[in-house]
Amino acid sequence: MGKKQHIAIFTTASLPWLTGTAVNPLFRAAYLSKDGERDVTLVIPWLSLKDQALVYPNNITFASPSEHEKYIRQWLEERVGFTSGFSIKFYPGKFSRDKRSILAVGDISEVIPDKEADIAVLEEPEHLTWFHHGKRWKTKFRLVIGIIHTNYLEYVKREKNGQMQAFLLKYLNNWVVGIYCHKVIRLSAATQDYSGSIVCNVHGVNPKFLEIGKKKREQQQNGDQAFTKGAYFIGKMVWSKGYKELLHLFKNHQKELSALEVDLFGSGEDSDEVQKAAKKLEMAVRVHPARDHADALFHDYKLFLNPSTTDVVCTTTAEALAMGKIVVCANHCSNEFFKQFPNCWTFDESKGFVQLILKALAEEPAQLTDAQRHDLSWEAATERFLKAAELDKPFEKKLSRSTSIYMSTSLNLQQTVDDASAYVHHVASGFEISRRMFGAIPGSLKPDEELSKELGLSDSGRK
């Protein structure tokens, strides 16, 4: 038997912040390590108490990394139903208020000792490497796989001078991802394109949603009415997360949809404005605070509406399908993966949106087969990841005799270009002035005394 693969998964966020880059890499680590064939380490940011208070909900904070790890493992075990065998390590991070995200401090690749460095998975590689100053990822690890979660270009386009910012960011992202990743997996075609990248949804749904869907299927098979409620939408309550499109569609088709009752669930900076807009409609649209999508409150809804085109792969759409519901969503590349499921109905224009809603109200959802349910699971997502990353076969680097000289010369030239490019980035990321120019948090070149003490870093690690 060959040597076990050691996979280190680096990500940009952590529970209890329920964002995609906190939740999905955690499930990935659990399912990659489930069969015991790989050694898996999840590497997540550690924040000072001050930053924890800004990021984590419900006043949850942790006095130590061990306390934080205990919380994460308990949360995970409650959802997957098995004890995970992966390890958790922390890297120093700081919260950027203006970017609303956590940025790494220092060389986070040092968290994995050189003797253990084998395969690195960078969840949001552009985010993790914008300001990276340290050992080159491709040098330290045999294989570096980047997973693109977010379309940062769409976010910056909404800011002041957005078009120019997006233009510059596109080239910065291409630069750092090319320098630091061997392979790039994009969750959908709604992300920025990268040279040599492949599109593959390597995410699954929380097993709880599949259990809910299984019970609903049993009710349908027994002839019971499984879905007694109408339509709903759930998501962070900001206009860009689908609320703008949804309320616009309702406003333009109030007469046709007069019999429809819709519940909107979410919290966010646009909550008050969404509520005001909903009240102006001549149809029943109720606005509620955010709730966990697995809450029993949602089980009996038949129809999930999601006209958003700003997601890369919408988690709530996957969850609704797993629960056996009909989903009406936009015919958009972010929903391409979901089109294989019989309950995913897509529309191109507002007329189609109305027709699908009326059809859904008159029909019952199709019962998902076991194979379709499997495709939504983390087991299937893990299979897709291993195949896309080519980790399901032995690692080999062989050149045929006829092409070896040409290929060797070509690879050497490419290596020289990559090395030069990496050197330029290393130099630029080593000066406070240039780091600040590109948006780094002041003083993030190395961990401060507080972070070093909390993580038990040596003085040499801070130099």
UniProtKB/Swiss-Prot annotation:
Query: Gene3D superfamilies of this UniProt entry?
Result: Glycogen Phosphorylase B
Cellular location(s): Plastid, Chloroplast outer membrane; Plastid outer membrane
Give the matching SUPFAM superfamilies.
Answer: UDP-Glycosyltransferase/glycogen phosphorylase (SSF53756)
Q: Which residues form the signal peptide?
A: 1-22
Disulfide bond positions: none
Q: Does the keyword Signal feature in the UniProt annotation? A: yes
Assigned EC number: 2.4.1.241
UniProt function note: Involved in the synthesis of diacylglycerol galactolipids that are specifically found in thylakoid and in nodule peribacteroid membranes. Specific for alpha-glycosidic linkages.
UniProt protein name: Digalactosyldiacylglycerol synthase 2, chloroplastic
Q: Which organism is it from?
A: Lotus japonicus (Lotus corniculatus var. japonicus)
